[in-house]
């Protein structure tokens, strides 16, 4: 009986039984786990939900098809917009637009407070509205146009300046421009700079352009008092660039006949040592000379700097002391000094002796002053030699102690025997003529010394 059974049919039956078992084991659909299997203390790392772990088959990340859609908790009628607005077009205006149109058509109602303010500012009594409504529109227009003071609108146009103030400002700017233009080293000033100034600045230009020494003295600073002429002198003016001061042009009146008119005096300043470079200052014109000029010793007051400087200069001193100022001493010049060169007697400006202090001030340091320079009388031959258009040259010498001395070289009109020692004695000051041998100095060394001196003077003026 057993041998008669077909093995193929047996195999078919076995396969059917296995498939039925597999179908029974496999879940038909997502079944909710029993409540005892959920543990709220557990948290899944995959989905972040509580009640199961990442290994559990209940995680929706593993069986995504079995994930349930979360249901809403409930509707909040208070916050939900139950009647949403539909988009309105121009053809179908909304109620807000209708309300605006009605308000514009209606006459504007004025409250009593607005009427009171209108009456206060405008000064006009409020108009009574007419029953037909025409007066209400006029009153609303009256509110829109205020009758009070209008605000001032600023424009880009510049306001007009008073011509008198404009002239003063132009004169001040021209004066500043001339001072700034003279601050460049090794530059000669032109005669037009003095003519561009106004009459007031022309009278006080000599006193204003002279720098004050860095050493502070008691009282007012000494000033070079001259009377500048408004026109060019007859004999022709010369420009002489000076070192160590802002006055870089001495315009000499070289007419010999003009010396016997009236006496005139001038006081020499106490010059600052090496404060400015060549070509600094303003043009000063001098008047005719005196009959009998008296000689006064001029002591060079050095302006000793706070720090050692290179290239100090001395202001040329050619002063003739008269009876108006009262010189401390009246000495006759030696014959060697009278033959050094011509010197003009500048005319005294409108100054009083109280405004011009004494010139014999001693420096605060215990350093001996340089030897005094005697002013020279003017000869007719030497004055006539300046009538031509001959250029004037300045000779600079470097001394052993590192200082500089300057001397004015003019065309020789007459030769006089001169000793070398006399020139060395006069080397701190500028003599108008010198026959001493010329010592050539490289321009770079001179320019560096002048730059150091000018920068130190600027620092001293800023500190003061």
UniProtKB/Swiss-Prot annotation:
Disulfide-bonded cysteines: none
Lineage per the UniProt record: Eukaryota, Metazoa, Chordata, Craniata, Vertebrata
Pfam short name (any one): zf-CCHC_6
Name of the protein in question: Protein FAM90A8
Superkingdom, natural source: Eukaryota
Family: Belongs to the FAM90 family.
Species in which this protein is naturally found: Homo sapiens (Human)
InterPro entries assigned: FAM90 (IPR039213), Znf-CCHC_6 (IPR041670)
Residue stretches of biased makeup (Basic and acidic residues): 74-89, 97-114
